[in-house]
Curated annotation (Swiss-Prot):
Keyword Iron-sulfur: no
InterPro entries in alphabetical order: MPN, RadC_JAB, RuvA_2-like, UPF0758, UPF0758_N
Keywords: Hydrolase, Metal-binding, Metalloprotease, Protease, Zinc
GO biological process, one term: proteolysis
Disulfide-bond pairs as recorded: none
Ranges spanned by the short sequence motif JAMM motif, renumbered to the chain: 173-186
Protein name: UPF0758 protein RALTA_A2508
Species in which this protein is naturally found: Cupriavidus taiwanensis (strain DSM 17343 / BCRC 17206 / CCUG 44338 / CIP 107171 / LMG 19424 / R1) (Ralstonia taiwanensis (strain LMG 19424))
Residues of the MPN domain: 102-224
Family the UniProt entry places it in: Belongs to the UPF0758 family.
Amino acid sequence: MTISKWPACERPREKLLESGAAALSDAELLAVLLRVGAAGKSAVDLARELLHRFGSLTALFAAQGQALAGVRGMGAAKFAQVQAIPELARRALAESLRLPSGFDSPDSVRSYLRLTLAPLQHEVFMCLFLDPGNRMVASEELFRGTLTRTSVYPREVARQALAHNAAGIIVAHNHPRGTTAPSQSDIHLTRELARTLDLIDVRLLDHFIVAGHEIRSLAESCERLPGL
């Protein structure tokens, strides 16, 4: 049965308009975005199939075209729709971090880093450059590595900080198939970054590690890094 023949109170779009987006399940929200399904398959059926196949929204949004092409009803247009969601979310969060009150909420920073780093299957080291008012002036991926490691050069981080006239920096990297527990090299790198940046009067505010849905602040959790 097509969604148009469902009772109005059960149709995802009408349910959203009546009760708000929070009242919908993940599959129902995804169905609103997809709009239509395929022959013999409603948009809700298609959404449920996608969530079942990929296991989570995070994995679905990180999926590439070839993986999605294996699902009947997922053409280029729907792939583009699915890919647009996390990118819009990242841009909205980045926009909020550029406001005067952006860094008043640590959750916004964590959410932005999760959205950016969690889906990646290789290690990435990124920097958020802040002005004296703690507004983000730039967000850049500086180094990219393999599944298990990446090489980071503190002098290049310092050079970019000067280029952006930054007063402070937040750095982050991901552990694609690991945990957020910092390695000895993570601790050593953070110390080296703090020392190098101190020479140019730029403060390293924090170093975050992202692994899946988890995120760890080394400034909050690591006793071996006093002063961050």
